Design a protein with these regions (language model features):
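Helix-turn-helix
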Residues: 11, 15, 19-53, 57
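Hydrophobic alpha-helical connector segments
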Residues: 57, 71-101, 153-157
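Short, basic, alpha-helical segments at the C-terminal edge of helix-turn-helix-like DNA-binding modules
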Residues: 60-66
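Amphipathic alpha-helical packing segments from all-alpha helical-bundle domains
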Residues: 81-84, 117-143, 154-158, 185
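Amphipathic alpha-helical segments used for helix-helix packing
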Residues: 82-85, 97-121
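Amphipathic C-terminal alpha-helical segment
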Residues: 93-96, 140, 160-177, 190-200
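Hydrophobic alpha-helical segments that form the core
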Residues: 101, 106, 151-170, 182-190
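Short, low-complexity, charge-dense intrinsically disordered segments
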Residues: 208-218, 226-227
Length: 232
């Protein structure tokens, strides 16, 4: 229709998402969003409502694009490999200069006390979705015997999610993939430890006290010496 500027909603959301991701929610002004999206205030407000509603839509856009690209790796049938691939996707994004630093959800969670309850709920909801996705992979590993049933799958899911969010937080100031790989290597050693535990629990042996071996040897010698020799 003549006189009405047409635009692609997803493209506008991508641009708004990048602006929020780069500057943060509070620091991004309406003028910044107008400049980033290329549409006027009237169209911006008419389509998305206020800044808060646009930000909530940008969070959904982030999850449906950047976030899902990482968590799609969890579909790998090998559970351990699935977790590794999730981390690999995260490292690729974190070390790619075309993306802003950190993660829009992680960055916002650090800023969240000033963002309002609605945004805080959105962050918590997303964290729950991520935790559940990892948890399902771990439960599958327990079902096929590659992860011990004695392990707390929910706690492990929270641990791996914490490592992922930790990488995102570190990424605010560091883009070295070697740093992130070190974090992942240690995290995966936790998996290996959990996988190695037998169903009946780890086999524990009491450490031999220093001197026990020598003491046993002395006792054996004493016993041999106490046996009388037959006289001929």
């Amino acid at each position: 229709m003549a006189g009405i500027k047409q635009f692609d909603r997803d493209e506008v959301l991508d641009r708004a998402m990048a602006a929020f991701w780069t500057r943060g929610y509070e620091a991004t002004s309406i003028d910044d969003l107008v400049q980033a999206t290329g549409i006027g205030r009237g169209s911006l407000y008419g389509t998305f409502g206020d800044k808060r509603q646009l930000f909530l839509a940008a969070l959904d856009q982030y999850w449906n694009t950047v976030g899902m690209e990482m968590f799609a790796e969890l579909s790998d049938p090998d559970a351990r490999h699935a977790i590794e691939r999730m981390f690999d996707a995260l490292i690729r994004r974190a070390s790619n200069p075309k993306f802003p630093r950190g993660c829009l959800f992680t960055n916002t969670s650090l800023e969240c006390p000033t963002c309002g309850d609605e945004i805080a709920r959105k962050i918590a909801e997303n964290m729950g979705q991520q935790e559940t996705a990892i948890y399902q992979v771990l439960r599958k590993a327990q079902a096929d015997g590659t992860l011990s049933q004695t392990q707390d799958a929910r706690a492990l899911a929270r641990f791996f999610l914490g490592v992922a969010w930790g990488i995102n937080a570190v990424n605010k100031s560091v883009a070295d993939p070697g740093v992130f790989r070190d974090m992942v290597r240690v995290a995966m050693s936790v998996w290996d430890t959990a996988a190695a535990v037998q169903i009946d629990g780890p086999r524990m042996t009491e450490p031999r006290r220093r001197g026990d071996a020598h003491g046993s040897a002395r006792k054996k010698v004493a016993v041999r010496r106490s046996v009388p020799h037959n006289s001929k």
